[in-house]
């Protein structure tokens, strides 16, 4: 297994990993009202697992701030999420994948 912490430029880069069945952990930060549907109102830093995208491009995550298992899976607005990620951490992403995939950045 290979693991890297890397800055990615946008959600399209995350999508390329998701399309290869590789989830990506991202660090987000947001103020009240900046990420609709989040289980916390604001945060200076919070890790989420991006696990997919809807047909319309919204971001499907596992958010550990959900109070119950059924509240962990969330779908966030793509533009709001990308802003919270890029402004919050500069695009920091944690990628863990089998070495055989030959991750390149």
Name each model feature, range by range.
Residues 7-66, 104:
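Active-site-adjacent substructure of cysteine-protease-like catalytic cores
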Residues 41-42, 53-105:
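Noncatalytic regulatory segments and standalone regulatory/sensor domains
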Residues 2-5:
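Helix-adjacent hinge/juxtasegments
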């Amino acid at each position: 297994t290979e693991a890297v912490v890397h800055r990615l430029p946008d959600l399209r880069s995350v999508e390329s990993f998701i399309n290869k069945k590789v989830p990506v952990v991202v660090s987000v930060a947001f103020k009240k009202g900046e990420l609709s549907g989040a289980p916390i109102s604001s945060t200076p830093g919070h890790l989420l697992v991006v696990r997919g995208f809807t047909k319309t491009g919204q971001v499907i995550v596992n958010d550990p701030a959900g109070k119950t298992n059924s509240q962990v899976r969330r779908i966030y607005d793509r533009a709001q999420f990308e802003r919270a990620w890029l402004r919050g951490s500069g695009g920091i992403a944690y990628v863990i994948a089998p070495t055989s995939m030959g991750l390149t950045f």
